[in-house]
Regions:
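C-terminal tails and terminal domains of large nucleic-acid-associated
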Residues: 865-899
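A conserved P-loop NTPase coupling/switch region
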Residues: 66-87, 179, 189-191, 211, ...
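SMC-family hinge/dimerization module
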Residues: 171, 180, 262, 266-268, ...
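Amphipathic heptad-repeat alpha-helical coiled-coil/stalk segments that mediate oligomerization
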Residues: 400-477, 481, 496-543, 585-649, ...
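Short hydrophobic targeting helices and cationic amphipathic motifs
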Residues: 7-10, 25
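Basic, polar low-complexity surface loops/patches
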Residues: 26-360, 377-383, 387, 445, ...
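ATPase nucleotide-binding head domains, primarily ABC-like/P-loop NTPase cores
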Residues: 71-72, 257, 326, 336, ...
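Structured, non-catalytic alpha/beta "coupling" segments that mediate domain-domain communication
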Residues: 211-213, 266-295, 300, 310-311, ...
Length: 899
């Protein structure tokens, strides 16, 4: 019944084909859909059963040397991979779409499919054709799904970015809390955290998940993979954790919450499903608390371009500008540091002290960075080994990495005045001498990835293996001698002994000499006739071929056995090896930050207890670097926020540098709490618990939000979440609507930040009227970016000065941008009239200075000239008699009631 339903689901009208057949054998595909009476063949039944198991994943169905895809999977894959869509067999009289990729090149195709958002199920042959034939009455090779390849479960180098972590994240709602379990299985990193709804978005933004898994029915995170709710049961999750890590109690992890147990259970269950029973490497999970790091929501990350630029990609981001790491592990650690700056002053200072140690010792720094260049990616090689996807090359990388770590340990251990953090890291680089020495003896210098051809176990490691190899070499030498003898014997100089996977060894002669060797008594047996050649066998050749094959087979088996032993050794030492990889990454990051600081004369920030932000000579690292490439100099500016003056209102012309000033101070805070030097002459600050940026605007049409709506949503989040220890930058709040509405909103937001949130804030605006708030808000300070006009042209100085801007220079900026002269002239005339009207009537600013804090909006009716007011205005009180006055009073009261 299920098969019938599935076949009906595959609409015949939709099965259209195009393109040419791929150049590979078609016998398997023809066998799949060959029944003329529309009855599915056994192979079709097998395929459809596996497809049902694969669900919404594309099914890579192994057929010989190719992975084949059929029906809708074929159409989707062909479109994504830009490969030919062909057809094999029929269903309901219509050709069935098919495409395929070679097994040996599958990783490249998988990478493109995963990047396009697909998930792939790999169905491999689980027995050989000979094994299938040995089963009575069955010749169909058994296949099964051996792995699901998804964005969050990748371990192969070709499918991963070496500089970026690859996070799989599971979220479990339990009561009012959300448990988050996050893992990078390529390195074994595993963390748990519990958050409330208000911090969920910021935590997910920090983790930047490649794949998100949630329980079925949880609709708050669109795009997440839905998994059975039973996988997210907190009791089951606790049992799963204990079983996976062989723990008697979860106390060794820490005070783990029910929400974290539920999320961990969901994540581990998904990994078991993806690996079809083969579990990847997971370290014992690290418990995190939300208050341990600076909270940054997604809007702020996008605005500040922390890990990626606004146009996508790494170029132009803060990470790209700061990153001077040598190793992939170091690059990933730096990205993690910038994504989650610390809130612990002691830990920040420990990082800064190590950076300073490298900064102040350039020769040591250069030597360490040179040593790091010899390091392979130990963490990811270890991850593949633990996941059962390791190769001899991975073992070689672990060997070389641990050997380099040992040498680095000796060098750094001999240095004087080491900082405390370095002393904590160095012991992790020791203790692997036995592994390094064993792998050095066992493996060749550059082991291959492919094991099918052997050659990765070094000579001298196993005497028996060496003898098998000698036998194979002797056999090949004997065949070369046999070839020379056959040439002399037959007189055919073009005779050759060749080898292929189908025939093995054979004698080949040009077609014109074929008859001579076919004659009786020659000792040759005909094997194959080609267009231009004839192939033969001989008893002597067969005997040598058997010897070579047997020796080669035994040698491959011996190498495989040694490889398994070496893999088991690495598995037994996986935790200390992973710890070494982490230590090397931290050393790389520290030396890299020191290098970056030395390149641009950055300074070490100083943290104090009270909430201040005192920056002298602050610069925007990305903008400064871009200007330097064109030979221009960045204008540094100071910022001094204190409890007494914690809110700066910054005005001035467009292009004057307001947004850059705002962003550079936010980036300085972020870098400082990440443990980095900062682009400034000096920096003194109190810890920031939340960082908010409302700079720039864009539509979110997919979610039905205009530019102004996006601005208001982000501003609302800031007003709701910012605390007294937060740092907020706001740029042009209210510009997306009418002048009156925008000014009113900006006015109220400034008051709210000042009176309710009471946080450190930089607020840039073009509303000159806001400067009147300085008269009523004690902690507000006025500043502006300087500009001047010279011979009719605007000169932007990019310097910050005290006090409000005298005017906005908007028309001058428009002229600078190239607006037509007649448009600029007309704008100047209109502006003159508007400013004259404002002077005469009080205009836009009339009465604003008298507004009390948080006053209710003035009723729109009061702004209108109504009938009641007109009547009172026209009234001549002296001309009224007492009776007329009384009647008028009743009339006015009645009119007021109707109003």
């Amino acid at each position: 019944l299920a098969l019938t339903i599935y076949l009906q689901f595959l609409s015949p009208n939709a099965l259209l084909t195009q393109g040419q057949a791929l150049p590979h054998p078609t016998v398997f595909a023809n066998a799949l859909f060959m029944a003329g009476d529309n009855t599915p063949t056994p192979m079709m039944v097998q395929y459809l059963g596996l497809k049902a198991k694969a669900g919404d994943c594309l099914l890579f169905y192994r057929m010989g040397d190719f992975f084949e895809l059929f029906f809708d999977d074929a159409r989707a894959a062909a479109a994504t991979l830009d490969i030919a869509l062909t057809s094999r067999g029929e269903h309901d009289g219509k050709p069935i779409p098919m495409c395929g990729v070679p097994v040996h090149a599958a990783e490249g195709y998988l990478a493109r499919l995963i990047k396009a958002g697909h998930r792939v199920a790999i169905a491999e042959q689980t027995e050989s054709p000979d094994q299938a034939k040995a089963r009575v009455g069955k010749t169909l090779v058994t296949r099964d799904i051996v792995r699901f390849v998804t964005a969050g479960t990748l371990t192969e180098d070709s499918l991963l970015d070496s500089w970026a972590s690859n996070m799989l994240v599971a979220v479990a709602p339990v009561g009012e809390f959300f448990g988050i379990a996050a893992a990078d299985i390529s390195t074994g990193y595993f963390e748990l955290v519990t958050v409330t709804g208000g911090a969920l978005e910021a935590e997910l933004a920090r983790l930047s998940a490649s794949e998100l898994v949630v329980p079925d029915g949880f609709a708050e995170l669109p795009g997440a993979i839905l998994r059975p709710r039973a996988d997210f049961d907190s009791v089951v999750g606790g049992d799963v954790l204990r079983q996976h890590f062989a723990l008697n109690t979860l106390d060794s992890i820490g005070p783990i919450t029910r929400a974290e147990q539920a999320a961990a259970g969901g994540l581990i269950s998904y990994l078991a499903h993806a690996g079809q029973g083969k579990m990847p490497f997971l370290k014992l999970p690290v418990r995190r608390e939300v208050h341990e790091h600076l909270l940054i929501d997604q809007a702020t990350r996008d605005s500040l371009e922390i890990n990626s630029a606004s146009k996508g990609g790494r170029t132009g981001s803060l990470l790209a500008e700061v990153d001077r790491t040598i190793t992939g592990a170091g690059a990933r650690q730096l990205a993690a540091d910038l994504a989650a700056p610390l809130m612990d002053k002691a830990k920040i200072d420990a990082r800064l002290s190590l950076v300073q140690w490298f900064h102040d010792a350039p020769l040591t720094r250069d030597a360490v960075r040179a040593a790091l260049r010899q390091l392979p990616d130990i963490a990811r090689a270890l991850g593949r080994v633990v996941a059962g996807r390791g190769s001899p090359r991975d073992l070689g990388q672990i060997r070389d990495g641990l050997d380099a770590a040992r040498a680095l340990r000796e060098r750094l251990g001999a240095m004087a005045d080491r900082p405390e953090l370095l002393d904590q890291l160095l012991p992790a680089l020791d203790g692997h001498g036995h592994i390094v020495d064993l792998l050095a003896r066992a493996l060749v210098t550059s082991p291959p990835t492919d094991t099918t051809q052997g050659g990765y176990i070094a000579e001298g490691y196993d005497a028996a293996l060496d003898m098998l190899r000698v036998a194979g070499r002797d056999g090949r030498q004997a065949i070369a001698q046999l070839e020379a003898r056959y040439r002399d014997m037959t007189g055919i100089s073009a005779l050759k002994i060749r080898h292929n996977a189908v025939l093995g060894y054979f004698v080949e002669v040009p077609a014109k000499h074929g008859d001579a060797l076919m004659a009786a008594g020659t000792g040759f047996t005909h094997r194959q006739t080609m267009a231009g050649a004839v192939r033969f066998n001989s008893p002597e050749l067969h005997e040598e071929a058997v010897r070579i094959t047997q020796a080669g087979g035994h040698a491959l088996a011996a190498e495989a056995a040694h490889l398994e032993e070496l893999m088991a050794l690495i598995l037994s030492r996986r935790d200390p090896i992973a710890t070494s990889a982490d230590a090397l990454a931290r050393i790389d990051v520290s030396a890299a930050l020191a290098e970056r600081a030395a390149q641009s004369n950055w300074c070490r920030p100083n943290f104090v207890a009270h909430p201040c932000l005192e920056i002298e000579g602050g610069r925007h690292p990305v903008v400064e670097s871009a200007l330097a490439k064109s030979g221009d100099r960045f204008i540094a500016n100071d910022c001094k926020l204190s409890p007494e003056k914690r809110l700066w209102l910054v005005s001035g012309p467009n292009m004057g540098g307001k947004s850059t000033f705002l962003r550079q101070n936010a980036l300085i805070v972020l870098l400082a709490q990440a443990g980095s030097y900062v682009p400034a002459t000096s920096a003194r600050l109190g810890l920031v618990d939340r960082l908010f940026s409302r700079v720039g605007a864009s539509d979110n049409l997919a979610r039905g939000r205009s530019t102004f709506m996006v601005e208001m949503v982000e501003t609302a989040a800031i007003l709701a979440q910012a605390t007294e220890r937060s740092f907020v930058i706001l740029d042009e709040v209210g510009r997306g609507t009418s002048t009156y509405d925008g000014l009113a909103i900006a006015w109220a937001v400034v008051e709210g930040i000042h009176e309710t949130n009471r946080c450190r804030c930089l607020f840039a605006t073009h509303y000159h009227e806001l400067t009147r708030l300085a008269d009523s808000l004690d902690a507000l300070s006025l500043h502006h970016v300087r500009a001047k006009e010279y011979k009719g042209d605007l000169v932007l100085l990019h310097e910050l000065a005290d006090g409000p801007a005298d005017r906005s220079y908007g028309i001058a900026v428009a002229k600078l941008a190239g607006l037509p002269p007649q448009v600029v002239a007309r704008a100047s005339a209109v502006l003159a009239k508007l400013e004259k009207g404002r002077v005469e009537t009080g205009g836009l600013a009339a009465g604003l200075g008298d507004l009390p804090l948080f006053s209710a909006a003035i009723d729109a009716a009061e702004a209108k000239v109504d009938a009641l007011r007109e009547k009172l205005t026209d009234l001549d009180i002296d001309a009224l008699s007492p009776r007329a006055a009384l009647d008028l009073l009743y009339e006015l009261k009645r009119a007021a009631g109707e109003t």
